[in-house]
């Protein structure tokens, strides 16, 4: 694991030295001194605008001209317009620096924060850069028996030279905890579905959360049947692996602090059931439990900080498999709420899982607010691509807060509409509702949201986050490799911390 230290005095044992320069390309007195030590290498580089313009995210790795000493490379990082810098951009810059260091095979680097960054203290800037680098260091290689030499290389340590190293280290300690929660989410999403059965996944949740003082209850199929969870159980009835409902309760606040319920879709693998998906890219359905993983990650981040809040997490863990015992198109299931649903498409299963999970959360814990997170519909990806997740809500203030926090942590949300006409599209001829809309190909993400909305009690604030387009990526980003993104952990953690 990457080791990050904050120091008041610069060490001479680092192979790479990082400095930051904005688009004005001006050197302050500290950078002038550093430039002189390196025989004008920094000033020569920024004078040649073909090499370096100072725009945000530009990284220039230059071999050092100093013959003695450990520093082999200078790494110049562009800040762009400092007035436009955000916390998310600074974190991404940290990730890019780490990636360039890996490409240049620089195993130890020092970040020198000599110039003042407008709007950010040096310790805040330092902790954000460190957070981005730490997030970018994530790898999932546990099933790789051989690695290429380039893949084996990793940056061993980062030393950050700042004027208040103690405060920077305290800030980073929290960010590191949140990053480790993101890593859990990425790990469990990347895990092959033959390994992370509902039982194994539930055990991992217990193992990770109980040391933080979170009460975890794993409910099996017999108890779910007694509770009347016909919708969730119907999804999993074709699998030989028993479905689980995992209930996590963190009581960090006083009794008068309202409870928030986080509910996640945990479809361990989604074949589509009898409404079978095409085989192309079906392997990516290992990520169909990304909503549940985001909920667990948020619980880790909140409980790890001992925040004075009351949070409940409920995740339904099922496999949607075809078999002689599988749910059929046209089946009618009775949900825990007593409402009935006609299953017109067994591949619209996530909303069935959520229907019972959100009802259970409301019945048992009486939350003020319910936020469900799910890789629910392909339709949201058609609408928003991989840039935004969809946000549906019955409360404008709740939606606005989530969207604002999403911008701040670069886990973006776009408000999507709820409307009576969408709700009417899920009416069924033989049951209370159908699990898909009655107009093929129309408003798929909106009708799915309305299905869940029918299980939200009056007076409960609710938001539904459809993360199908953002939970995993087929390309690397500044903050991590391709595969599971860990989307939602930082969004939910910051929302809970700032608004509860």
From Swiss-Prot:
Disulfide bonds: none
Keyword Hydrolase: yes
Keyword Hydrolase: yes
Co-factor binding details: Binds 2 manganese ions per subunit.
Residue numbers annotated as active site: 277, 351
Binding locations of Mn(2+) 2: 265, 270, 288, 349
Localization annotation: Cytoplasm
Listed cofactors: Mn(2+)
EC number: 3.4.11.1, 3.4.11.10
GO molecular function, one term: metalloaminopeptidase activity
InterPro entries named among the record's database cross-references: Leucine_aapep/pepB (IPR011356), Macro_dom-like (IPR043472), Peptidase_M17_C (IPR000819), Peptidase_M17_leu_NH2_pept (IPR023042), Peptidase_M17_N (IPR008283)
Enzyme class, spelled out: hydrolase
Pfam families registered for this protein in UniProt: Peptidase_M17, Peptidase_M17_N
Catalytic activity of the protein: Release of an N-terminal amino acid, Xaa-|-Yaa-, in which Xaa is preferably Leu, but may be other amino acids including Pro although not Arg or Lys, and Yaa may be Pro. Amino acid amides and methyl esters are also readily hydrolyzed, but rates on arylamides are exceedingly low; Release of an N-terminal amino acid, preferentially leucine, but not glutamic or aspartic acids
Keywords on record: Aminopeptidase, Cytoplasm, Hydrolase, Manganese, Metal-binding, Protease
Annotated GO CC locations: cytoplasm
GO annotation terms (biological process): proteolysis
Gene3D superfamilies associated with the record: Leucine Aminopeptidase, subunit E, domain 1 (3.40.220.10), Zn peptidases (3.40.630.10)
Tree of life domain: Bacteria
Binding sites annotated in the UniProt record for Mn(2+) 1: 270, 347, 349
Function: Presumably involved in the processing and regular turnover of intracellular proteins. Catalyzes the removal of unsubstituted N-terminal amino acids from various peptides.
Family indicated by similarity: Belongs to the peptidase M17 family.
Protein name in the entry: Probable cytosol aminopeptidase
Organism in which the protein naturally occurs: Rickettsia felis (strain ATCC VR-1525 / URRWXCal2) (Rickettsia azadi)
Primary gene name: pepA
């Amino acid at each position: 694991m990457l080791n990050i230290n904050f120091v008041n005095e610069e060490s001479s044992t680092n192979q790479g030295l990082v400095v930051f320069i904005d688009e004005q390309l001006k050197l302050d007195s500290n950078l002038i001194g550093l430039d002189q030590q390196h025989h004008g290498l920094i000033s020569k580089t920024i004078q040649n605008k073909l090499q370096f313009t100072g725009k945000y995210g530009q990284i220039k790795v230059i071999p050092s001209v100093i013959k003695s000493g450990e520093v082999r490379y200078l790494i110049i990082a562009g800040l762009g317009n400092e007035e436009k810098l955000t916390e998310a951009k600074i974190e991404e810059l940290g990730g890019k620096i780490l990636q360039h260091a890996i490409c240049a095979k620089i195993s130890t680097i020092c970040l020198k924060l000599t110039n003042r960054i407008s709007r950010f203290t040096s310790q805040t800037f330092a902790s954000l850069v460190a957070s981005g680098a730490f997030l970018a260091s994530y790898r999932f290689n546990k099933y790789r028996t051989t690695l290429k030499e380039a893949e084996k290389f990793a940056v061993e340590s980062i030393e950050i030279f700042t004027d208040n190293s103690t405060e920077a280290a305290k800030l980073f300690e929290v960010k590191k905890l949140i990053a480790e929660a993101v890593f859990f989410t990425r790990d469990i999403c990347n895990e092959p579905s033959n390994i992370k059965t509902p039982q194994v996944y539930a055990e991992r949740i217990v193992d990770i959360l109980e040391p933080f003082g979170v009460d975890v209850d794993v409910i099996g199929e017999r108890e779910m049947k007694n509770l009347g969870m016909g919708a969730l159980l119907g999804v999993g009835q074709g699998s030989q692996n028993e479905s689980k409902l995992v209930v996590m309760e963190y009581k960090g606040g006083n009794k008068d602090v309202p409870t928030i319920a986080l509910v996640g879709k945990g479809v361990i693998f989604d074949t589509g059931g009898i409404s079978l998906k095409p085989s192309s890219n079906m392997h990516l359905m290992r990520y169909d439990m990304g909503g549940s993983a985001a909920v667990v990650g948020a619980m880790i981040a909140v409980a790890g900080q001992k925040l004075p809040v009351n949070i409940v997490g409920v995740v339904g863990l099922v496999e949607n498999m075809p078999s002689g015992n599988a749910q059929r198109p046209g089946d009618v299931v009775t949900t825990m709420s007593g409402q009935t649903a006609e299953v017109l498409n067994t591949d619209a299963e996530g909303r069935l899982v959520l229907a019972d999970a959100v009802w259970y959360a409301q019945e048992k814990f009486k939350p003020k607010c319910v936020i469900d997170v799910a890789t629910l519909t392909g339709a949201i990806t058609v609408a928003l691509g991989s840039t935004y997740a969809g946000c549906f809500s019955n409360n404008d203030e709740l939606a606005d807060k989530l969207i604002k926090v999403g911008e701040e942590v670069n886990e973006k949300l776009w408000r999507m509409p709820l409307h009576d006409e969408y709700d009417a599209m899920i009416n069924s001829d033989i049951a209370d509702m159908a699990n898909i809309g009655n107009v093929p190909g129309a408003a798929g993400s909106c009708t799915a949201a309305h299905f869940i909305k029918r299980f939200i009690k009056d007076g409960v604030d609710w938001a539904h986050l459809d993360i199908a387009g953002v939970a995993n990526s087929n390309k690397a980003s500044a903050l991590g490799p391709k595969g599971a993104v860990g989307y939602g952990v930082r969004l939910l953690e910051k929302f809970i911390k700032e608004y509860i």
